[in-house]
């Protein structure tokens, strides 16, 4: 995909930041398919366990809240001003999943070594068929386009290691994970199964009152206790697990004596939660700081 075409798409997508939130950007079907194909090729050329370097800014779930994504870029810097790692769940639930995923894929194509996208559990056909993305694709384009996204999502990497010390994924730990090479060796393209390592990396959750491994209220995967986080970090000589997947009131929340952090980047999620959104900045010394985007009814004030 030529650079000029990608630049035109990015320009179209970000010019609405001066408009009222919610204004649609109508790319052509051909442009979107090119984004899917070109980004898919890049995902497959890069490892399933990405190795990225600080400084980098990390973001959790976006869920089609496109105007919030643009505001997060305004505060953190539009690429290439900063390096970014997104932890998945770009689509479903929000009203502008297409704009959200298209801008992220376009940035991935333009800055493949500085802009990273991990897979969330909603980047899977069996989930986004139900929770809104399929319907949005069908309403604005057609089912065939949704299938192009499925082919792309099936190739997304599932975890990232920042300077060999911070392990990032969408969901959490797995009882099946004994070596990081297991992540590197997971097959792609693939759908997300209902059990096993890939499922857990996408869908497990920390549990404050859990010791070891517990049942998950979601009906899939596990919960894990602080003991499992400490054990995992010690075994693999890591400092922190960084994940998303759960709404947290302040946009970020520590667990297990600050050995794990949950980041959620969709403020006022679905218009139903009075939560803030957050972005974690990791500096060259691996010090983590958080930028908070308050919910809309609190005038979207951005604070450090």
UniProtKB/Swiss-Prot annotation:
Binding site for Mn(2+) 1: 61, 63, 89
Active-site residue numbers: 122
Pfam families documented for this protein: Metallophos, STPPase_N
InterPro entries, sorted: Calcineurin-like_PHP_ApaH (IPR004843), Metallo-depent_PP-like (IPR029052), PP1_catalytic_subunit (IPR050341), Ser/Thr-sp_prot-phosphatase (IPR006186), STPPase_N (IPR031675)
Entry-linked PROSITE patterns: SER_THR_PHOSPHATASE
Keywords linked to the UniProt accession: Hydrolase, Manganese, Metal-binding, Protein phosphatase
Family: Belongs to the PPP phosphatase family. PP-1 subfamily.
Enzyme nomenclature, EC number: 3.1.3.16
Keyword DNA damage attributed: no
Cofactor: Mn(2+)
Gene, per the UniProt record: NPP3
Cofactor: how and how many bound: Binds 2 manganese ions per subunit.
Binding annotation for Mn(2+) 2: 89, 121, 170, 245
Recorded catalytic activity of this chain's protein: O-phospho-L-seryl-[protein] + H2O = L-seryl-[protein] + phosphate; O-phospho-L-threonyl-[protein] + H2O = L-threonyl-[protein] + phosphate
One Gene Ontology molecular-function label: protein serine/threonine phosphatase activity
Name by which UniProt lists this protein: Serine/threonine-protein phosphatase PP1 isozyme 3
Enzyme class: hydrolase
GO CC terms: cytoplasm; nucleus
